[in-house]
Amino acid sequence: MARLLTKSSQVFDFLADRLSVRKSRRFWETQENLESSTPLLQEPQQSYRSNSFNELPPLSRSVTFAENEQPNEAVKLGTFEGCFIPTTLNVLSILLYLRFPWIIGEAGVLKTLLMLFISYAVGIFTSLSISAICTNGMVRGGGAYYAVSRSIGPELGGSIGLIFYVGQILNTGMNISGFVEPIISIFGKESGTISQFLPEGYWWVFLYTTCVLAMCCILCCLGSAIFAKASNALFVVIILSTISIPISSIFVHPFKDPSLLVHFTGLKWSTLMKNLASAYTENEKGTGYESFKSTFGVFFPATAGLLAGASMSGDLKAPSRSIPKGTISSQATTFLLYLLVILCVGASVTRTGLLLDMDVMEHISLHPLFIISGILSSGAFSSFMGIFGAAKLLQAIARDDLIPGMFFFAKGSSYDDIPYVAIGVTYLITQISLFWDINMLSSMITMTFLLTFGFINLSCFLLRISSTPNFRPTFRYFNRRTTLVGTILSFGVMFYVDRLNAFISFLIAGILVVVIYFTCPPKNWGDVSQGIIYHQLRKYLLQTNKARENIKFWRPQILLLINNPNRSENVIRFCNSLKKGSLYILGHVIVSDDFQASMDDLRKQQRLWHQFVLDRGIKAFVELTIAPDEVWGIRGLISSAGLGGIRPNIAVLTFINTNYRRHRIYSGSSFSLENTSEESESDSKKEFVEHDILPVKWVQILEDMLVGSVDVMVTNGFDRLNWPKRKGEKQYIDMFPIHRISGVGSEVNESTPTFATNFETYTMVFQLSWILHTASDWKQGCRLRLITLVEFENEIEAERESMHQMLETFRIKADVVVLCLAAMNLDAYRYIVKNEHVRPSKSSELENLLKDDSWWQEEKKRRGNTVDSLGPIRFPRRMSGYNFRSASFDKSAPPLSVPLSFRLGPHMHSVKSFETESSFGNRSLSPKQENRRTYSDSTIESSLMPNVVREDSSSDRLAPKKKIGRDYSKEKLTFNDLSSRSQYIIMNEIVLKHTKNTSVLFTVLPAPLADTHKSFRKSEEYVDDLLIFMEGLPPCALIHSKSLTITTAL
């Protein structure tokens, strides 16, 4: 018999190999939709670990080592004995003998056949899916769990593996209970038919099942070789026992035994017609009647053993070939056997015998030993297979280190890797399941197996629709429709049979997913969700190219350009709070003239930056580039960052590190440049590449940003940022929206220049301040506050009312603080504007600050010509058509930035841009105003702008005609007549007095004139002007915008 089985297995393998190489075409697809097929990946050579192991990515080393370290010297099994026989024997369940007659009597032949077709439809679709997954690469121990977890990730794969482990244990308990039932019916003291010597009773039966379970565990400890030898003999017994049922219906003479309630008619059409329909009886608990759902829950486990061969993957010679061949062949074989049994039993036994006689199979057989041997063989094999397969599965899960504390179960024997510890644990859990009866166990098994089958089909479906190039299984008989139908069918049947238990099963699976997600160390297995996300992301990114962004859905998309992330962590976190769930990119330039030599450094920096982002929980992308200098590198980042319609609209530049020079800008002044940068040398981290940058480069970068399409923000002082606290004194997010008017008029017609009101920047200050305030930490610990300036006291109330009206229009809730220059005791304002005495130290400080200001030097000359140098001076107001700088000063020394012009009521003048004879003439850095707008509603700005701004909007107001022969000595000097540096000094003093509790200050970035970067002196003076304004202030965010971001439209 053994030689016959060996020859049979050889013939089976030969035929299976021949069939597998045939070029067949799937009947459900057209020629162009055939799945791609590639040769199976070869097993790794012995030298792979020594030669290639050290070249693997760091994340995959531990996983690869754990998988490769297991011994491979044990005897491996072929397709027939390793997959076909286990699957066939596991499918031909003990339920065939113990519960099939009862199911046929309750549901009838037709509905029993329907159960058969539904069960095998689930089984066939699952077999196709698991075959496709297993033939896409090398399969190791763990079977279906290994294949699924490597396909859809450790979280979902691990939860499925644990649920399937529980299902196998419950199936083992059911088979052991079924194994003991015929023993009691044959040898029980009360119900024994052959001999009466075994005591009966609940605890006696429990003792018998415990002994059977212990014997199975002992056999499992002997290894898979013993299992293979035993399975061959058991296979012959079970096949003969199953075939004896239809043969008995033909050759056994009809009989009727009233004592046994059996009426055997032989094969008769009349008997089949009577048993065709269902006739449900009262259930065992007496709470209702049996139904299709309840009987299907008992029937399904009889067909659910299709993964038995896959569970033996660690003991197969070629799992990728054996699993699909053995599984599908076994499914076809067992389906035919079940079909014959249902038809023959339904056509030969009356309904009374089917319902009342649980041993009817034994009574109608040619000889009772056929059925008894089949029950004992099926129960023994299924019990052994369940324990051994479940233990191997637990061992595989433990070796993957998905849940802490399971490493103990990963141990195996030194020769053939027998999981002794896992077998012991499986024994204990199975022992607990023996307290339940067969019907309850079968219903729970149905839930666990259907859930496992559903997720196997789902994982294969996701792999197919992800269109991943590396998913090209050699098994060709599947497509996305078969996997989708298998998924829907599995989950649908699951909820149809028992909604409550199905929901509980999904809930347990979800809990396991969460647990594994938080406890499992990183795995380099890949995740099908990566392919799905990529596919969907690409589709939606293409759609963003078609849609034009509407101002109503504007949100900040930030590109933060930084040098060293360790020293700029505060500004990184600040921008992370500011992004409002949108795009956030960290950009960095590696300066190098040799691109190829810098690639290793680029890879190292990419790892460091990504690790930095992960460790800090920053939701940002990292974009690094190599360039000959910072200017070209940042140009490349700004022009290429983002993808599709998702591109940065705000470029954030940290303020220049002034450590390139080690001297003060003026002696004896409190304004020091040595420590003004938010990056401190002591905080540097040598693992990040960083470069000091000169003012000309920094200003050139800023000019490039200003002429581009993105808005600009410059940050300074964030190393001193005090993060808001939920408890304690409230801090402020201050808005200081200096409204600047830049003159861009033509030299040809100076009497009527064109003025561009930078209303976009004005509104951007409000928008970003409000967005920051919506972040949870900032909302709890900060309040919004608007700071605005007037020069005279009679303008305070009008300005406050105007600001409240504007905030209401913008739908922003904030405190309003109106500061009056004339009413405050400001040393700088008194000294510069009013020409009053101040402290000698203060006057010396101011003189040092203004010593290079040509306007101030001319002003001092004029003051020296006045009669009373201590009183207020008379000074001509600056007129728009009068080129004050050109008339009074050297044209070769133009200002480095357009002076700020405040809207301070009727006393305010607009200052025309200083004109120069430089190469750029009067060229503006920003695109023309009309080209910046994203819509054509010209009334929005006028409705949102403060009244004082609207009053000055006409050319007559902004550009009064020149009056020849005017007496300028009678004019009062006002804030608007000052040079830009003088205004910075006064603003610094007044803002500094009112920002003691300020966390962040949002204000306007004064733009440099075009080509300022071409002169080192001009660039340095521009940087100095900004430093003078920001000296001692809280962290500042200086903004320059070219597009409107606030709308009142619905």
UniProtKB/Swiss-Prot annotation:
Sites of Phosphoserine modification: S9, S60, S270, S901, S936
Glycan attachment residues as annotated in the record: N175
Residue pairs linked by disulfide bridges in the UniProt entry: none
Biased composition (Polar residues): 916-928
Transmembrane region(s): 84-104, 113-133, 147-169, 203-223, 233-253, 296-316, 335-355, 369-389, 418-438, 443-463, 481-497, 500-520
Extracellular side stretches: 105-112, 170-202, 254-295, 356-368, 439-442, 498-499
Membrane topology summary: Multi-pass membrane protein
Organism the protein comes from: Schizosaccharomyces pombe (strain 972 / ATCC 24843)
Residue list for modification Phosphothreonine: T64, T271, T939
Main location: membrane
Protein name: Uncharacterized transporter C18H10.16
Taxonomic lineage from the root: Eukaryota, Fungi, Dikarya, Ascomycota, Taphrinomycotina
Domain of life of the native organism: Eukaryota
Keyword NAD: no
GO biological process: cell volume homeostasis; chloride ion homeostasis; chloride transmembrane transport; potassium ion homeostasis; vacuolar transmembrane transport
